[in-house]
Amino acid sequence: MNSYDFNDADTQRKFAVIPAGTIATVRMTVRPGSAGEGGWLRRSNDGNSEALDCEFVVLNGPFAKRKFWSLFTVAGSTQGHAEAAKISAGMLRAILESGRGIKPVDKSDAAKEGRRIKSYGDLNGLTFVARIGVEPPQNGYEAKNRLDHVVTPDEKAWHPVTQEPAAAPSAAPAKPPSTPAKINRPDWSK
């Protein structure tokens, strides 16, 4: 039987939130949810809306490697979902503009093309400049970071970012088999 000794392990760490207003370069990862075209969207628990489930990793500065998350509603069955989808579309447009160096007022054909994607998977891995906010504690949960504002090229705080080559094509990863790998029963429990 294996033995694991954690007596010399560090005690757990508690992270404070990244201060509100922090400007940082972040990389967005879309966490596929097996809903919507290509499986990139996540369906809500009640099944009435679909959203992009996104993780943001800070790439530079004192908070490098720290993460925060956001859902972008893209479809739903209520007027509230429609309004949320409109807000999300504006934020996603700003993410494309920040990451691709497009000023929001640019109406050129190149700018219009830069705001188009073939799949939500095209957003996966996109790097852009963000202002990080803080959601106050609620419902027994501690305060957490959120994407407060996307900094676009028309703003003083914006700077060019380097996009890494896409790691995967514009399709969601294959869904894992529904049957998990067999876990062998330990000898002591027989």
PLM regions with names:
Residues 1-190:
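Short beta-rich binding modules
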